[in-house]
């Protein structure tokens, strides 16, 4: 395999581009310049991804908020329907009582 500084952007045998190796800064001795470069690269990557992440977080928050409002709205609607059904049930009891009174009175 070609060394990292050979100038060949593709590995000619496999046709793949080389990529950065993952290193552990606590185990390997790195110079202050290398550590500074790593921090700069991490910051640049974070700033590049931040707007997309922020947009996704906003969309997720709005979706959850809409779901909460829908649940509350449905709850209020079903409670108002429940009262309506109670009134119908009372009317049905009264109608049954009248029918029973007519049947026993005749």
From Swiss-Prot:
As for membrane topology, the entry says: Single-pass membrane protein
Q: Name one GO biological process term.
A: mitochondrial cytochrome c oxidase assembly
* Mitochondrial matrix-side positions: 2-57
Q: Which residues carry this modification: N-acetylalanine?
A: 2
Pfam families, alphabetized: Coa3_cc (PF09813)
> What are the transmembrane regions?
58-80
Q: Residues annotated as region Disordered?
A: 1-28
Asked whether the keyword Transmembrane helix is assigned, the reply is: yes
Keywords, A to Z, come to: Acetylation, Coiled coil, Membrane, Mitochondrion, Mitochondrion inner membrane, Transmembrane, Transmembrane helix
Q: Which residues form a coiled coil?
A: 78-104
Q: Name the domain of life.
A: Eukaryota
GO cellular component, as recorded: mitochondrial inner membrane
As for subcellular location, the record says: Mitochondrion inner membrane
Q: Does the keyword Transmembrane apply?
A: yes
Mitochondrial intermembrane-side stretches of the chain, per the record, are 81-106
Its biological purpose is as follows: Core component of the MITRAC (mitochondrial translation regulation assembly intermediate of cytochrome c oxidase complex) complex, that regulates cytochrome c oxidase assembly. MITRAC complexes regulate both translation of mitochondrial encoded components and assembly of nuclear-encoded components imported in mitochondrion. Required for efficient translation of MT-CO1 and mitochondrial respiratory chain complex IV assembly.
According to its UniProt record, which protein family does this protein belong to?
Belongs to the COA3 family.
The record ties this protein, via PANTHER family, to: CYTOCHROME C OXIDASE ASSEMBLY FACTOR 3 HOMOLOG, MITOCHONDRIAL, CYTOCHROME C OXIDASE ASSEMBLY FACTOR 3, MITOCHONDRIAL
Oligomeric state and interaction partners are given as: Along with COX14, core component of the MITRAC (mitochondrial translation regulation assembly intermediate of cytochrome c oxidase complex) complex. Interacts with MT-CO1/COX1, SMIM20, SURF1 and TIMM21.
Supply the name of the protein.
Cytochrome c oxidase assembly factor 3 homolog, mitochondrial
According to its UniProt entry, this protein's organism is Pongo abelii (Sumatran orangutan)
């Amino acid at each position: 395999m070609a060394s990292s500084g050979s100038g060949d952007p593709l590995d000619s045998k496999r046709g793949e581009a080389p990529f950065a190796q993952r290193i552990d800064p606590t185990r390997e001795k790195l110079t202050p310049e290398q550590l500074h470069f790593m921090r700069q690269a991490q910051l640049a990557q974070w700033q590049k991804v931040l707007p997309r992440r922020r947009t996704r977080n906003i969309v997720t928050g709005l979706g959850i908020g809409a779901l909460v409002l829908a649940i509350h709205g449905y709850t209020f609607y079903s409670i108002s329907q429940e009262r309506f059904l109670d009134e119908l049930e009372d009317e049905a009891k009264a109608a049954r009582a009248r029918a029973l009174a007519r049947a026993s009175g005749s």
